[in-house]
């Protein structure tokens, strides 16, 4: 492997802040005549450090690698994060992994990034170790569009509050989840709005807040996106108790059971609520569909979004 200019992190979601940092790595590599690299991990470190931790991921590993490939970085290195890696001090990690294994000569880190056992050391420590090891350590500037901090945690907060448009602006693309279609209760079909029911237990990513959303949908192994509306919640009109994800695809008919579906969230239309009757719910769904089609016809342009990378 050639000498590297690298950055390191979990890069969940590969959002605009991550890509700002990666662009800095690529520029420095080109200026220095080296190769650029992103070093990441196959799982969230807290999954190893806290055995009961369930991460609210913005992207699966496969999706993260796809997103990273679109940055045009020369190399992506995925480290297996286990107890032995977690036990390495920052100095040991820089010597054993960065210098000896990967031949990193310049390390560019985010302004708030820490690594090494217990993340107990900081930038000045990394600079000192780097001088001993022949690794120049550089702290990248913060990415603050409109004075807003872009981070995975901020994006998760947006999604938990149903603010998918805010999340998408920070991501730089439409937030997308993946899951398998399973059999449902057929309630939507009876109302004239047949739905594909997604397996909540298989979805590895954070679900947005309960509500009705304008979405774009496609089968994982196909091309072309279809408009749709998705409900996330507990189906209160039908006295449901467990969380469900149901998506109605516009202008589509066919059997989708067992297939993997990608769903991109465009905008939240309304909160989920209990209706007095099924007819009242059906009437509201028709209004929702009209509103969603109007959104797609007037304000949303798919070519302006990175949804095409999925």
Regions found by a protein language model. Name each.
Residues 1-60:
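N-terminal catalytic cores of NTP/NDP-binding nucleotidyl/phosphoryl-transfer enzymes
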Residues 60-77:
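A glycine-rich helix N-cap at a beta->alpha junction
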